[in-house]
């Protein structure tokens, strides 16, 4: 059997928490885990250049199958030599399957065994996405890590519906494996579903593990459920997954959830959060959230975060950034996006160091104390 394109190397476990330090090897380089992956929906992390992403330490980014299928079209990306070539990014890329967008963006959708009928959210055209189509698109994009096409039920969902959905997702996963035509160049991850139901998560994990994917994602979280529900589901789901393969929690990017996810054995995370909140002037800092549009920063000439050494904090003041964001200047959005991405990438570096030094539990306590996450009714992002 040929070498898998995706390989997980376990480095060590934190004695204090059990969190894992590891490294994932891909055809476009390796990255240490736990890792946060910036999201480049349309083959760009909004307002950031590939050079800036490398400068801040990003070794893997995510792109969206659904959006690239609609614009510019996977055939055009393939003609360009694949996504890496198209967007001038020579490090690892993960693509999602398009499933989440079909279920979250489209008003009209009809789920059948074959796949999903839905309307294009841009122009209302009728479209159809199936496991086979999702593989065809991702094979054309040429990402290092592809995701199986799954059903993303809403939260909360009735048990009976969720059971049928999990069974369908397992059948679709098998079809994805059969349709995947570049298994030596691209790794395909299965997605464990099951909502908050422990026995359904067990069933989903068992089905997918029998198919022997090179990695596994935990889907159906960060869809509106309370944080304690997410943590509880992770506590019984991550131990079900093979220890010698990467585990990816989809759609999670708030600092508290990244730390809590790592403590529960997760290796990979992605979310649009840092860039989305940056566009309206909400910033992550070592002392908690900072909304730079607030009037109190009008004459505040300090950097966004005095503990931060990013390009934004080394060069610009809160007052200047407030002015740019209030005037809708693109440069303001670039500065806030840079800072938030840098903050999360640096946070994950601190998490990895804490695992290395067996002190992630202490790190969490200090961080939550500083951020105010320990207070009753604490506000996350």
Swiss-Prot record:
Pathway membership, UniProt: tRNA modification; tRNA-queuosine biosynthesis
GO molecular function per UniProt: metal ion binding; tRNA-guanosine(34) queuine transglycosylase activity
Gene3D superfamilies named in the record: Queuine tRNA-ribosyltransferase-like (3.20.20.105)
Residues involved in Zn(2+) binding: 308, 310, 313, 339
Enzyme nomenclature, EC number: 2.4.2.29
Region RNA binding, annotated ranges: 251-257, 275-279
Keyword Cytoplasm: no
Pfam families with a match to the protein in the record: TGT (PF01702)
Reaction catalysis annotation: 7-aminomethyl-7-carbaguanine + guanosine(34) in tRNA = 7-aminomethyl-7-carbaguanosine(34) in tRNA + guanine
Keywords, ordered alphabetically: Glycosyltransferase, Metal-binding, Queuosine biosynthesis, Transferase, tRNA processing, Zinc
Assigned GO CC terms: cytosol
InterPro entries: ArchSynthase1/Queuine_TRR, TGT, TGT-like_sf, tRNA_ribo_trans-like
Cofactor: Zn(2+)
Positions annotated as active site in the UniProt record: 96, 270
Cofactor note: Binds 1 zinc ion per subunit.
First-tier enzyme category under EC: transferase
GO biological process, one term: queuosine biosynthetic process
Function description: Catalyzes the base-exchange of a guanine (G) residue with the queuine precursor 7-aminomethyl-7-deazaguanine (PreQ1) at position 34 (anticodon wobble position) in tRNAs with GU(N) anticodons (tRNA-Asp, -Asn, -His and -Tyr). Catalysis occurs through a double-displacement mechanism. The nucleophile active site attacks the C1' of nucleotide 34 to detach the guanine base from the RNA, forming a covalent enzyme-RNA intermediate. The proton acceptor active site deprotonates the incoming PreQ1, allowing a nucleophilic attack on the C1' of the ribose to form the product.
HAMAP family per UniProt: Q_tRNA_Tgt
Homology family: Belongs to the queuine tRNA-ribosyltransferase family.
Subunit structure, as described in the record: Homodimer. Within each dimer, one monomer is responsible for RNA recognition and catalysis, while the other monomer binds to the replacement base PreQ1.
The protein's name: Queuine tRNA-ribosyltransferase
Lineage: Bacteria, Bacillati, Bacillota, Bacilli, Bacillales
């Amino acid at each position: 059997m040929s070498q898998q394109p995706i390989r997980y190397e376990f480095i060590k476990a934190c004695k204090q928490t059990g969190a894992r330090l590891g490294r994932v090897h891909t055809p476009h380089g390796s990255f240490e885990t736990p890792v946060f992956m910036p999201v480049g929906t349309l083959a760009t992390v909004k307002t950031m250049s590939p050079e800036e992403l490398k400068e801040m330490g990003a070794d893997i980014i995510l792109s969206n199958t659904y959006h690239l299928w609609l614009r510019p079209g996977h055939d055009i990306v393939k003609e360009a030599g694949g996504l890496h070539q198209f967007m001038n990014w020579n490090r690892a890329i993960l693509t999602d399957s398009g499933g989440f967008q079909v279920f979250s963006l489209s008003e009209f959708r009809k789920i059948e065994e074959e796949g999903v009928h839905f309307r294009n959210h841009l122009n209302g055209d009728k479209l159809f996405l199936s496991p086979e189509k999702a593989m065809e698109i991702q094979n054309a994009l040429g990402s290092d890590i592809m995701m199986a096409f799954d059903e993303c039920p809403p939260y909360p969902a009735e048990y009976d519906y969720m059971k049928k959905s999990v069974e369908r997702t397992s059948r679709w996963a098998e079809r994805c494996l059969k349709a995947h035509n570049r298994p030596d160049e691209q790794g395909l991850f299965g997605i464990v579903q099951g909502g908050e139901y422990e026995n359904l998560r067990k069933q989903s994990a068992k089905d997918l593990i029998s198919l022997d994917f090179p990695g596994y994602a935990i889907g159906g979280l960060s869809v509106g459920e309370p944080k304690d529900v997410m943590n509880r589901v992770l506590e019984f789901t991550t131990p079900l997954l093979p220890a010698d393969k990467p585990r990816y929690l989809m759609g999670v990017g708030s600092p508290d959830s990244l730390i809590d996810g790592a403590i529960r054995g997760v290796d990979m995370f992605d979310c649009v959060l840092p860039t989305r909140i940056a566009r309206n002037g909400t910033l992550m800092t070592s002392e908690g959230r900072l909304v730079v549009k607030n009037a109190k920063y009008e004459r505040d000439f300090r950097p966004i975060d005095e503990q931060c050494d990013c390009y934004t904090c080394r060069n610009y003041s809160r007052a200047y950034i407030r002015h740019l964001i209030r005037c809708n200047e693109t440069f303001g959005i670039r500065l806030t996006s840079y800072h938030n991405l840098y903050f999360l990438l640096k946070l994950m570096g601190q998490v990895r160091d804490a695992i290395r030094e067996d002190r992630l539990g202490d790190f969490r306590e200090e961080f939550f104390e500083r951020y105010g996450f320990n207070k009753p009714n604490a506000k996350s992002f």
